[in-house]
Amino acid sequence: PVPDSGRIAALEMARTLGVQYREGFVKNRYIGRTFIMPGQSVRKDSVRKKLNTIEGEFKNKNVLIVDDSIVRGNTSKRIVEMARSAGAKSVFFASCAPPVIHPNVYGIDMPAREEYIAHGRSVDQICEAIGADWMVYQRLDDLIAACTGDSTNAVTFDCSCFDGCLLYTSPSPRDSDSS
């Protein structure tokens, strides 16, 4: 997995697939979330400083890299490059989130939608852009089912980054102008 964001999902994937869970990256815990850092060059440089590979986990192996999400694709692309540089034969990539195609209007400072790797691209095009041999995104309905389990309680999730549907809307300034 990509530490630490992909670890929980990677553990469950390994169990479900019946394969041994392995970690091939070591994380520098003093580097923050790269997708929210200002400027493309800062983000790219930070990915390399943030992660180092354990070559023995990649050399001559087919690997599945699991991360929590893909926003711009910079981190995913760099991680795939690092796995290949460490000797991976094939690199497969799994995103625990559906494609991010809409901004988060509730407070997370996300880039303009044109900067999202999933904006206007197919999964095959995204796979090619990050340099993976194959990739898969979590389906939104599966993500919701995984979070709710067998619960019969009605639960509403903010899925606006994936489906564009806002839970709450606030009036625009002109709508609230009563004069």
Explain the meaning of each model-derived region.
Residues 61-71, 75, 120-130:
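Phosphate/diphosphate-binding loops
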